Amino acid sequence: RCGENNCVGHDDLDVVFQFDKQGRILTQFGAGMFEWPHGIDVDDDGNVWVVDARGNEERGRGHQVIKFSPEGVVLLRLGTAGVAGRTRTTLDQPNDVLTAPNGDIFVADGHPGNGNNRIVKYASDGRYLMEWGETGSNPGEFRTPHALAMDDDGLLYVGDRSNRRIQVFEQDGTFVRDFYNMGRASGITIHNNKLYVADSESRYGSNPGFRRGIRVMDLDTGFVIAFIPDPDPTPGGTSAAEGVAVDNEGNVYGAEVGPRALRKHVAR
């Protein structure tokens, strides 16, 4: 996030970086385009989708999802730059984006607990298709839908962070089930039928009984089978991984906002 927790005043710093396995930078882009870069997804064609979770109308930035080519060329924008709203053409502090295998696009919209709290679905060309969700704690309702993932059956997983659960939906918004044993989900991903959840907020007074870190669930059983604790055990502000990814060798990567680091946890 431009060396801090947002990009305001840091227009010279790139936002997206591609590294090789040794950590060397291969590509970087996005300088001067974002207020608060938040969620990221890479589609099957290698295009990079980045969410800007805050906005400023005067600067004409934010409240958008931007699609880049692998080289950093802007291909598509969802939402109206700098304009917050809840319409077919506006977003308000979107959190995450996910592209389905058929090209459909899902956006988790609404960072505040009392915000938009909806999932918006678009066609691959950016046409609005549908949406579902409102503020609440019933099935299909949200309080900060912070992260998205999709399993091999095409089910959509939503990290409903302030409700301390994962909700699962069909792609038309039909509720399937939910989980309450994964903490406060800031980032989620699915690999080899395992659900990985980055919980950056469970700490003293915030989510009693849970610790910050990355939890791993076996989706066949619904049981948590592994836990990677936050490397920083102190109970201060958010420092643990907010984003999580897994490579083909099973190594787990945590995107840590506080330390401004990408930490690799090697599979054994």
Placement of each model-derived feature along the sequence:
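Eukaryotic scaffold repeat domains enriched in small/polar residues
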Residues: R1-R268
